[in-house]
Amino acid sequence: MDNNTKKKIAAFLISVGLVTGVSNYEGFRDTAYVPVPGDKITIGGGFTTREDGSPVQFGDKITRNESDIRLTKDLYSYRVKIGQCIKVSVSEGQANAFTSLSFNIGTGAFCNSTLVKKLNQYDYQGACQEILRWNLFQGKPLKGLTIRRQGEYKQCLS
C-alpha cells in the first residue's frame, strides 16, 4: 500500500472518529424532543433544523441511518466553514475538536470567538483552553456540555 492510499484511509478513519465522537456527545432520538428546558426542539444526532432549513417540530421523526448520513454531511460542511476563519495549520485532532465545537455552538459563534483569535496568532494552547469556556447554557454550566468540552479540549491537545 502506497503512502497516498494510507493517508486517504487515515483521513477516512479520522472522519469516522469525528462522526462517532459527535454522535456520542449528541446522543440519538428518533422523535423530536427538547434536550433541556429552554432549548430548541431537537431530533436525531442533535439537529434543530430539518434538511430544508426549517425548524424541527414536535412529531418529526428520523431513522438512525438518516441521522448518521446527515451528521456526516453536516460535519463536513462545518469543517469547510470553520476552515475559512482558521488561518493557521492545525492537527487532525484540533480540526476534529473545533468541528465538534462549531457543530454545537454554530460557525458564526466559533469564527467570532476568542478561540479563533488566539489560534490565528499561533496560540494553540490558548485556543484549546478556550474550548472549556463554552460549557454554559442560559448562563449556567451544564454537566453534559462540561463533559463534552473536556473531551474536545483533550482532543485539541492531541
Where are the regions that the model predicts?
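Active-site-proximal beta-strand/loop segments in catalytic clefts of secreted hydrolases
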Residues: 26, 44-46, 101-103
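Long, amphipathic alpha-helical surface segments
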Residues: 1-39, 47-54, 62-73, 79, ...
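Active-site nucleophile-His-acid catalytic modules used for acyl/amide transfer and hydrolysis
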Residues: 77-109
